[in-house]
Regions:
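Active-site gating/metal-coordination segments in enzymes
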Residues: 24, 66, 72-151, 206-209, ...
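Divalent metal-coordination and catalytic microenvironments
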Residues: 35, 51, 59, 88, ...
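Catalytic pocket-lining loop regions of alpha/beta-barrel enzymes
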Residues: 83-86, 90, 130-239
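Acidic-and-aromatic substrate-binding clefts and catalytic sites of carbohydrate-active enzymes
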Residues: 36-44, 63-71, 93-100, 124-131, ...
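A general structural detector for well-ordered alpha-helical segments in enzyme core domains, enriched
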Residues: 46-50, 71-78, 103-107, 136-140, ...
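Mid-to-C-terminal alpha-helical segments outside catalytic/metal-binding sites
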Residues: 2, 22-30, 35, 45-49, ...
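Cleavable N-terminal signal peptides
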Residues: 10-11, 21, 221
Length: 288
């Protein structure tokens, strides 16, 4: 009996050695990076080269506000140099200023941009704490509703922050808010918000293996909770890399991040992956 068991175990070990690991199905279709930034004037060249290597059709460049006074020039130059690959949002002035909406209206008329942002509502690292249901931001949402132009916000959700966000969403149902980085929240919290607010979209930007919380480690599987929610509500999510610091624009790192993105998308049902990868962004931002 012992000899039989030993032989069986040896056979299993041999089979494990010669049987290849299950192949990972990478998503191979088009991609739109729905949330990008520039750290300097030249990073766009490295990024576009990586886009071409990885079949990324478009990147939506967003502003980060007063911390980069020159970014408007960098973004304008990128648009002119790569008009087929780069789209851009309108930078939002101080969202607590009652004049901000009027300034945005002028810029939207001038640029024909299809998104406003990124607006920092709650960012603990920079000690930013703003109320999205406050009067100045309400004017911005009114403009969003009138022009049909979504606004991207950075809002690190707590129960109180989520309540304020929901009040803003309820005030202008025709305005679309895109919650960047999934609000650094949980699938359970977002599922409730999404179910109650049809005018809320989620971009999954910056949730790669270089940051926390991440959708997946560099070689690990897609988190089960995120996979379940994305599959359940595939029309509410978009991918984005949210690259900003210069070290992330190094070619080798870009290759790793873009490969990771395709691997994670490959874990979703093909029709869901296609929506998250590019269809939702193309529809929301009117991208070709």
């Amino acid at each position: 009996m012992r000899r039989t068991v030993t032989a069986a175990l040896a056979a299993l070990v041999a089979l494990a050695v010669i049987t290849p690991a299950a192949a990972v199905d990478y998503y191979s279709g088009p991609l739109i990076d729905a949330h990008g930034h520039l750290p300097n004037a030249t990073a766009i060249d490295t990024y576009v080269a990586a886009m071409r290597r990885h079949n990324i059709r478009k990147v939506m460049l967003l502003g980060v506000g007063p911390v980069q006074p020159q970014e408007a020039e960098w973004i304008d130059a990128a648009l002119k140099k790569y008009p087929d690959l780069v789209a851009a949002g309108v930078r939002v002035p101080d969202p607590t200023n009652m004049a901000a909406a009027g300034q945005l209206d002028v810029e939207l008329a001038r640029t024909k941009a299809r998104v406003m942002g990124e607006v920092h509502i709650r960012q603990t690292g920079s000690k930013i704490e703003r109320d999205p249901s406050g009067p100045a931001f309400m004017r911005i949402l009114e403009l969003s509703a009138q022009r049909g132009v979504p606004v991207v916000i950075h809002d690190e959700l707590t129960p109180a922050a989520a309540a304020s966000l929901e009040a803003a969403l309820a005030a202008y149902r025709q305005a679309t808010i895109v919650l960047a980085h999934a609000g650094e929240s949980t699938p359970a919290t977002l599922e409730r918000l999404l179910a109650r607010n049809a005018n809320l979209m989620i971009d999954l930007s910056g949730m790669h293996f270089q940051r926390k919380p991440s959708l997946a480690k560099e070689k690990g599987p897609l988190d089960r909770g995120w996979k379940a929610l994305i599959t359940k509500m595939p029309d509410r999510f978009m991918v984005g890399l949210d690259l900003w610091v210069a070290r992330l624009f190094e070619p080798a790192m870009l290759d790793r991040l873009m490969t990771w993105t395709r691997r994670v998308l490959g874990e979703l049902p093909p029709d869901v992956a296609e929506q998250i990868a590019w269809k939702n962004a193309a529809t929301l931002y009117h991208l070709d």
